[in-house]
């Protein structure tokens, strides 16, 4: 019984310590999505630009080391040539390291994100093509995609600037990848 009480106290202390030490980030991002289609000898790339908003929480790993794990959700809408539109929900999970440089903290991070594509379409000469429906025997694009993420946050007081690169780990469609670059500004609370 003493062991159970001791484990309960340790669990409560860990939970309370984690909750009090968490950092919540809110951000608005400029997003560039590069869709690269490899057909034939030359790849074709379509750059799509837009915005995303997101919220995430960073919690310290056990111990006094400056490592954190971060998880959150972003909603992204990007627009490209041929009246292309892509709307996605992104769930990032990453490991961060905190570097204190006086008044500025650098938080380099690496991890994975799961992307759920909500809407993907192109309009050409009055015809709208849905990326996620197979037409004329072509295979449809995948609604779910796994991406890596690499980046860094620079934090000053309660504000931060973030640069992140999200290379595709799974294809958007046959011989088609989607890579993202985000430049974000936000605040912590």
Give the residues covered by each predicted segment.
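Cleavable N-terminal export/targeting peptides
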Residues: 1-25
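Short stretches within intrinsically disordered, low-complexity N-terminal or propeptide regions
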Residues: 10-14, 35, 156
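Amphipathic, positively biased hydrophobic alpha-helical segments used for protein targeting
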Residues: 11, 19, 40, 122, ...
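Basic side chains
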Residues: 2-5, 27, 59, 153
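Short glycine/proline- and aromatic-enriched beta-strand/turn motifs that initiate or cap beta-hairpins
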Residues: 20-59
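Outer-membrane beta-barrel transmembrane domain signature
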Residues: 33-34, 46, 51, 59-67, ...
């Amino acid at each position: 019984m003493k062991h159970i009480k001791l484990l309960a106290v340790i669990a409560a202390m860990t939970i309370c310590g984690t909750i009090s030490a968490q950092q919540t980030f809110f951000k608005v991002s400029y997003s560039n999505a590069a869709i690269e289609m490899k057909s034939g000898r030359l790849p074709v790339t379509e750059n799509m630009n837009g915005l995303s908003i997101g919220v995430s929480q960073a919690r310290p790993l056990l111990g006094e080391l400056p490592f954190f794990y971060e998880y959150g959700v972003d909603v992204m809408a990007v627009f490209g040539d041929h009246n292309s539109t892509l709307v996605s929900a992104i769930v990032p999970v990453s490991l961060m390291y905190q570097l204190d440089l006086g008044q500025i903290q650098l938080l380099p991070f690496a991890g994975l994100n799961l992307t759920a594509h909500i809407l993907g379409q192109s309009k050409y000469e009055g015809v709208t093509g849905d990326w996620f429906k197979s037409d004329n025997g072509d295979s449809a694009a995948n609604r779910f995609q796994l991406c890596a993420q690499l980046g860094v946050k620079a934090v000053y007081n309660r504000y931060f600037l973030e640069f992140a690169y999200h290379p595709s780990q799974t294809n958007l469609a046959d011989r088609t990848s989607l890579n993202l670059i985000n430049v974000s500004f936000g605040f912590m609370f």
